[in-house]
């Protein structure tokens, strides 16, 4: 079995739980997810099966869309609703214009510091391991892309009796929505946290494309594999090059290819090679031999 499943991860499960259960449902060990979702978050989680596991990094690199509920006036240890409250402040009136001004400032390339309760590694240990031991460590900042921030709940002012608002976030990989909630609060002059989160899109998969674990289980029992998308779905945004029989045979053996073959796509950092409509391999310019391209991943098996 090879392909990509757009899974709807339900609240209360870890991403690893989903992989474990799918291995049992699909009767295959080669299962990998494409970016962790916290247990209390539900949403789109593309799962790579079989040879598609070689594409996981490309699927992960694609943009994401989230719908978050952000609460002003309270901050927590984890930056979400699961943590202990560490700061509070009564809200004065915050106009929709003031909020929009902050959202505009945080659109584009921004710098984030990952939360202490996260899986980012420092000196070989995950940050949440330090946090659980009560140890604060210096966290590396990272630049992330925020493509758009759109308020979804109308234009009401925020105040003590109405401290929450809904926000749709379109962003690049590595963005912490919890941290974004805190940053919005800081610019407004208030403690804040992310009180709810749902991922409505991951790469090329939307909420309406998804299947739950129970739906996949039922479909498997009925020998219905319509939950499985072809490998080519994972490289939709990648530049493609059609190859012939002769080149195909070389690619299956992991051969270096002449740069002249890639003249139409020479400005690309990687190219998907397609033979008879199927993804065969992903190639990139050779770092030392400037007249050659080399395989980054050979996807199709050489069964000769």
From Swiss-Prot:
The protein's Enzyme Commission number: 5.4.99.25
Alphabetical UniProt keywords: Isomerase, tRNA processing
Residues the record marks as active site: 38
GO biological process: mRNA pseudouridine synthesis; tRNA pseudouridine synthesis
Annotated catalysed reactions: uridine(55) in tRNA = pseudouridine(55) in tRNA
Molecular-function GO terms, alphabetical: RNA binding; tRNA pseudouridine(55) synthase activity
Alphabetized Pfam families for the sequence: TruB_C_2 (PF16198), TruB_N (PF01509)
Primary role: Responsible for synthesis of pseudouridine from uracil-55 in the psi GC loop of transfer RNAs.
Membership in a protein family: Belongs to the pseudouridine synthase TruB family. Type 1 subfamily.
Protein name: tRNA pseudouridine synthase B
